[in-house]
Design a protein with these regions (language model features):
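A conserved mid-protein helix/loop that constitutes part of the nucleotide-sugar donor-binding site
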Residues: 35, 190, 197-212, 227-230
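Donor nucleotide-sugar binding/catalytic pocket of nucleotide-sugar-dependent glycosyltransferases
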Residues: 132-133, 144-181, 284
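Nucleotide-activated donor-binding/catalytic signature segment of Leloir-type glycosyltransferases, i.e.
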Residues: 221, 229-254, 261
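Acidic donor-binding loop of glycosyltransferase active sites
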Residues: 257-279, 294
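Short hydrophobic beta-strand element within catalytic cores of glycosyltransferases
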Residues: 264, 286, 295-298, 308
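Short acidic/histidine- and often glycine-rich active-site loop of Leloir-type glycosyltransferases
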Residues: 272-273, 300-311, 315-316
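Conserved acidic donor-binding segment of nucleotide-sugar-dependent glycosyltransferases
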Residues: 310-311, 315-322, 331-336
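A short, well-ordered alpha-helix in the C-terminal region of glycosyltransferases
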Residues: 324, 331, 338-353, 362-365
Length: 369
């Protein structure tokens, strides 16, 4: 079912999605969290009146198919945290909604929306897509301020201690299967691909160490720590490694289609010794690569083994094990027919479990419960 053009023929609640992280090609941050919220809202707009609200440097009102997008301009940033914006005009959007779906729990905007919901009787739900900032949830639990928690993986529900809670649900994530699709006219060029923010917990340094010197590697994503970027450049010396910090969707799909494989080598403990319990809550770039019939390699970290079936749609390797990762990279290059079968199985897995229409279908059942 397309997210554009289909008319609604039944009454449905007005749903408001709130994305605290900055949003949009000029104001936004490259990453899976923003794409997740946008695509869920876009596909939901086919079934019910849907608005997506986020924040940016300038005020914008746009439409995407049947989705209304309101970017609130010039917000106040709590404690100068750029991903923790608040604005009074948010409350006018809350008044119009029957159901509110926040896409980050631990920011002040979401806590305010949840409190308004409790006072006004509106149903407010939350999906935690990672990140956060100063919030009252750092002092008191806001879990029950929300009607329900909609987790994007089993790991997410477990790590937040809600796996036995009746108000905590798993809706998973999806991919636009029309956009992210294989093209038989595009030849695989043997490039290994990483897509995501260049942050230490992504384990990109392990991938750089693992890549054979004669195998091309492309790293697509914005750097967020200058020290880490410089360390990656040092590790990449003498290898066929390229960095691409800006990439639109057309170029990204082409990169997925041409790649030997997509790798997401995230870690709990970074090369600097820092520890994260939630390095990945889903693994959106794995899903996008798999939708393009590209096999994937991930580490046995967080939610990623829920996506990649080891030996079927790709490989799951131990975290921070460059030797094991390098071995699987060489195997995929040496056995192209088997790699192709893995890619086909990967797309079938996404079609069976990780499409946006299936995610959208799960949400209204929970919204109305």
């Amino acid at each position: 079912m397309s997210a554009n053009g289909q008319r609604r023929s039944h009454y449905a609640p007005r749903v408001l999605h709130i994305v605290p992280a900055l949003f949009g090609p000029n104001d936004g941050i490259f990453g899976g969290a923003e794409r997740y919220a946008l695509e869920l809202a876009r596909h939901m707009s086919v079934e019910t009146p849907t608005t997506l609200v986020s924040f940016g440097e300038r005020e914008r009102l746009e439409t995407l198919g049947q989705l209304k997008i309101h970017v609130i301009g010039n917000p106040w940033h709590v404690c100068n945290q750029r991903t923790n914006p608040v604005a009074l005009s948010l409350f006018s959007e809350l008044r119009k909604a029957d159901v509110v779906h926040c896409h980050q729990q631990h920011v002040l905007t979401s806590s305010l929306a949840a409190l308004v919901g409790k006072l006004s009787g509106r149903r407010v739900f939350v999906s935690d897509l990672g990140g956060g900032g100063w919030d009252v949830s750092g002092y008191v639990s806001t879990d029950r301020w929300y009607r329900g928690h909609l987790h994007i993986s089993e790991y997410s529900r477990k790590v937040f201690g809600q796996d036995d809670m009746p108000w905590a649900h798993v809706i998973l994530g999806g991919v636009d299967m029309e956009k992210f699709a294989p093209d038989e006219t595009v030849l695989r060029d043997g490039t290994v691909l990483f897509v995501g923010r260049l942050l230490p917990h992504k384990g990109v340094n392990d991938l750089v160490n693992a890549i054979p010197s004669n195998m091309p590697l492309e790293l697509i994503g914005q750097p967020h720590e200058e020290r880490f970027l410089e360390d990656l450049r040092v590790l990449a010396k003498g290898k066929r490694i390229s960095f691409r910090h800006d990439c639109d969707d057309v170029a990204l799909v082409q990169a997925y289609r041409k790649a030997l494989c997509v790798v997401l080598p995230s870690v709990y403990k970074t090369m600097y010794g820092d520890v994260s319990k939630v390095p990945e809550l889903l693994g959106q770039t794995l899903l996008e690569g798999m939708a393009c019939a590209t096999p994937c390699i991930c580490t046995d970290v967080a939610s990623m083994p829920e996506i990649v079936e080891n030996g079927v749609t790709g490989f799951v390797v131990p975290a921070s094990d460059s030797a094991a990762l390098g071995e699987k990279l060489r195997w995929l290059r040496e056995y192209p027919h088997e790699a192709r079968r893995m890619g086909q199985a990967a797309r079938e897995r996404v079609l069976g479990k990780f499409t946006w229409p299936s995610v959208v279908q799960r949400c209204p059942e929970i919204y109305s419960a």
